[in-house]
């Protein structure tokens, strides 16, 4: 049986309302997808957690009049009259197998691979991090994640301490440990991030070298040789005084989660304390790195 789907972008606050409405007008299923590869974690009891930038995907029978669906969405006032959307025909498939087949081991830099658990590692002599894409893991396909992983791979982390500020699923901290760091420290505002990072570290055999702190419990005198923060430009600027103090003198700093158009303002917040490298861009995103003065 064939299907037709509509995909539209929404905020986390409106996604559920749009989902309910699509089901009311005939959708056989509605799913939420992250549009920016941002980690999201298991909800607390009674809570639904969504990405701040969420794609809503409604699946309909192939005979459905999708023009009428679009008109109904506009009439509902849940979307703007000129809302961006994509409609496409979908063949009937083994969706679980299709989903698994879409995730392949990915290489970042010269040494580092991120591999889903159901795949054989391409190079047993490489640095392999085993992480499954899902609710608690950004897949690594987003440019900001890739930029940070490539940067970590380029460093000599042997014997060093690394802080992953805004650790999410712990992918950067775990990668740093696998790349030779002596110790890693993950910091996040979300308790679910701390739990996810711990579980992923356990699965990769590095939990004994990873310390995890909620931001409010971060030790006052905490410092590291390397600090990486893949969050957003706003928090990177607002939290610059805190992030700067985390880096030891002559230590390395890597920042991402930044649109290329935001790079200049983020650089201004860190330039007084760091000798900054040239900004590296990937698609519309960028990475800022430097060494503390």
Swiss-Prot record:
Compartment(s) where it occurs, according to its Swiss-Prot or TrEMBL record: Cytoplasm
GO biological process, one term: methylation
InterPro entries the record matches: Ribosomal_L11_MeTrfase_PrmA (IPR050078), Ribosomal_PrmA_MeTrfase (IPR004498), SAM-dependent_MTases_sf (IPR029063)
CDD domains: AdoMet_MTases (cd02440)
Coarse class of the protein's main subcellular location: cytoplasm
Keyword vocabulary terms for this entry: Cytoplasm, Methyltransferase, S-adenosyl-L-methionine, Transferase
Key word Chloroplast present: no
Role noted for this protein: Methylates ribosomal protein L11.
Family, per entry: Belongs to the methyltransferase superfamily. PrmA family.
Protein name (database record): Ribosomal protein L11 methyltransferase
UniProt lineage: Bacteria, Pseudomonadati, Pseudomonadota, Gammaproteobacteria, Pasteurellales
């Amino acid at each position: 049986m064939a299907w037709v789907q509509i995909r539209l972008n929404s905020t986390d606050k409106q996604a559920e309302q749009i989902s309910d409405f699509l089901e009311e007008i005939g959708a056989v299923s509605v799913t939420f997808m992250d549009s920016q590869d941002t980690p999201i974690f298991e909800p607390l009891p009674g809570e639904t957690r969504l990405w701040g930038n969420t794609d809503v995907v409604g699946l309909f029978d192939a005979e459905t009049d999708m023009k009428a669906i679009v008109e109904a969405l506009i009439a509902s006032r849940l979307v703007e009259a000129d809302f961006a959307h994509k409609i496409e025909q979908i063949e009937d498939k083994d969706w679980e197998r299709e989903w698994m087949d879409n995730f392949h081991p990915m290489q970042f830099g010269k040494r580092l691979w991120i591999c889903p658990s159901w795949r054989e590692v391409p190079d047993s002599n490489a640095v392999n991090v085993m992480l499954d894409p899902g609710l608690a893991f950004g897949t690594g396909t987003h440019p900001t994640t890739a930029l940070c992983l490539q940067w970590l791979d380029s460093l000599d982390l042997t014997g060093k301490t690394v802080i992953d500020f805004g650790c999410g699923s712990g992918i950067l901290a775990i990668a740093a440990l696998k790349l030779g760091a002596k110790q890693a420290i993950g910091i996040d505002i979300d308790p679910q991030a701390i739990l996810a990072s711990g579980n992923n570290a356990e699965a990769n055999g590095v939990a004994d070298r990873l310390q995890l702190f909620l931001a409010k419990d971060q030790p006052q005198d905490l410092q590291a040789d390397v600090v990486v923060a893949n969050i957003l430009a706003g928090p990177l600027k607002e939290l610059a005084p805190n992030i700067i103090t985390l880096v030891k003198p002559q230590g390395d700093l890597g920042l991402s989660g930044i649109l290329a158009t935001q790079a200049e303002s983020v650089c201004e917040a860190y330039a007084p304390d760091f000798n900054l490298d040239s900004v590296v861009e990937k698609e519309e995103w960028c990475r800022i790195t430097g060494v503390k003065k």
